[in-house]
């Protein structure tokens, strides 16, 4: 880590209260592949992306969620538990948890990802949270993950088991728009972009032909969901 990177790592720990014995693990968890690629091309060999940590974190998350489900819902059918596990470990939930941590603020992103709104993209936030879980697991063990996140995930899982999750931004936006404008929102693919070799879809959500928000994603569906989320939050803010 260089000095500017170390400051961000230290600020993350200060703001979240999640302290690391090995700060290099935290730094790696916060490094998106776009940033690692840029730094590697610039000659730095000490910067590794969070992809391997994400791989481990996916397994840690699955165990963590399954343990909560197994202990709290002993009478539930296996099929219901499996569906709840998928929902609790979904991109949407992980992105919500990441936003509560303000994780996006501390991510190291390449210039392209920064420019295209990667800091608030669900997929990047969800992947980074999985990487963070792995870093915590390696640094302090499984018990620390339970200490930090068990209560929060129990609340999400309770909502899921009651059928209250997941929050569907497209449906929520449609309800608001149709109640006020009597027409559904329209999703329009406006362009595709290249970012570190990846194809990024850019979708605009329109009401009565007027653009109200734009979203980006690795698939058209992901971009539509992101556009719906931004539009929904914007309309709620305007109402308040």
From Swiss-Prot:
It comes from Thermotoga petrophila (strain ATCC BAA-488 / DSM 13995 / JCM 10881 / RKU-1). It is found in: Cytoplasm. InterPro entries: dsRBD_dom (IPR014720), RNase_III (IPR011907), RNase_III_dom (IPR000999), RNase_III_sf (IPR036389). The active site is at residues 58, 130. Residues 168-237 form the DRBM domain. The gene is rnc. This is Ribonuclease 3. The keyword Thylakoid does not apply. One of its GO terms (molecular function) is double-stranded RNA binding.
